[in-house]
Amino acid sequence: GGSAFNVIPDQVTIGGTLRSTNKDTRNDMLKKIKNAAQGACSINNCSVNIEVRPGYPSTINDKKSAKFASTVFENSFGINSLNKEEKPTMTSEDFSYMLQEKPGAYIWLGAGEKSEKLHSAHYDFNDELLPIGAEYWASLAEKILE
C-alpha cells in the first residue's frame, strides 16, 4: 500500500488464505483468483506476481473414528456436554497429514462460552479443563485397547 489512504502506491502486496474441503475446489478458486488479478492488471496497465505457498491439506475426519470419539465423550461426560458440529470448520492443522495416512478424528475440547477465541490476544487457557481433557484421552485409550 501507499503512505496514505489517498496516495496511489508504486507497489501493493495483497495476502490471504484460501481454504476448502476439496482439493479440486481449492485449485479452481486459485485459478479464478489468478484470472481476476491478471484481468484487473490488464485494464489498469500494471503487472501482477502471484506467489502461492501451499499450506496444510484439509482436515477431514474419518466418520467411524469421529463417531467413536463422540461416543466415548458422551459415555464419560453425558450427551449434553457434546457439540456434534458437522459443518466444516476450515481448520488449518498439521494433524491433516496424519489423517491422510490413517483414519482418525480431530476433536476440540471447548473452553466454555465465555472464553476468548483460541488465536485471540486475550485468550487465557482454562486450567479447569486439564482434568477433563486427561480423563477423555485416557477413556479413548482404554476403549481403543478393549
Identify what each model region corresponds to.
Residues 1-146:
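Metal-dependent amide/peptide-bond hydrolase catalytic core
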